[in-house]
Regions:
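Conserved N-terminal substructure of TIR/SEFIR domains
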Residues: 1-93
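Cross-kingdom TIR/SEFIR domain
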Residues: 16, 58-62, 70-73, 79-183
Length: 184
C-alpha cells in the first residue's frame, strides 16, 4: 500500500516541482543559487523510516531527483545537528511527511520551523504529505498532536514561546495544500 502511495507522491511532487519552474535534475543546480539537493525529507523515523519514506526516497532517487534524508536517530535530549539545518538551507524544496508521532519529536518540530523559515526567506518549496493522520487533526492539533504538545509544555515550562512557535509551524504546514493517505 505505501509503495503505491510513495510512487504517487513522487509523481505529484515531480509535477509540482515542474509547475514551479524547477527543471530537475540539472538546471536547478545551475541557477544563481547553488542547490545541493532537490528535496529535503522531514519525517518521524519511528513512523515511516522503514516503510513509506524509504520508498519515497528511492522513487525520487531513481528518477534523478537528489533527495536528502537523515538516516540517524536522534537520542532523547540531543539538539538538531547543524548539518541537518545546512541540508535544509541547501535544498530547493522540502517534503514534510506528517505522521501520528511527528509532533512528539522536538527534532521534527525544530526541522519544521527551519523549513518554514527558509520558505519565507529564500522561497523553499514545501509539500505536505499527511500519512496516517487526518489533516484536520494536525491543523487543530487534536489527538496525538494535542498529547504531544501537552508533553512539550510540561517538559519545557520555561520555554512556552518555543512550544508556541512549534504549534504555529505545525498549523502553518497543515494549511498548505498537500496529499492525504489514510493508511494506518
Amino acid at each position: 500500500m505505501y509503495l503505491k502511495f510513495a510512487w504517487l507522491s513522487f509523481r505529484i511532487v515531480a509535477m509540482a516541482l515542474e509547475a514551479h519552474g524547477v527543471d530537475y535534475p540539472s538546471s536547478s543546480f545551475g541557477s544563481a543559487r547553488r542547490w545541493k539537493y532537490h528535496v529535503f525529507l522531514s519525517f518521524r523515523g519511528e513512523d515511516t523510516r522503514r516503510s513509506f519514506t524509504d520508498h519515497l526516497f528511492c522513487a525520487l532517487q531513481r528518477t534523478g531527483i537528489k533527495a536528502f534524508r537523515d538516516d540517524e536517530e536522534l537520542e532523547r535530549g540531543e539538539v538538531i545537528k547543524p548539518s541537518l539545518l545546512q541540508a535544509i538551507e541547501e535544498s530547493l524544496s522540502a517534503i514534510v511527511v506528517i505522521s501520528p508521532n511527528y509532533a512528539s519529536s522536538t527534532w521534527c518540530l525544530e526541522e519544521l520551523s527551519k523549513i518554514l523559515h527558509f520558505k519565507k526567506e529564500s522561497g523553499l518549496h514545501v509539500f505536505t504529505i499527511f500519512y496516517g493522520v487526518d489533516p484536520s487533526d494536525v491543523r487543530h492539533q487534536r489527538g496525538s498532536f494535542a498529547e504531544a504538545f501537552k508533553k512539550h509544555e510540561d517538559k519545557l515550562p520555561q520555554d512556552k514561546t518555543k512550544v508556541q512557535d512549534w504549534r504555529d509551524a505545525l498549523e502553518e504546514v497543515a494549511n498548505l495544500s498537500g496529499w492525504h493517505s489514510d493508511y494506518r
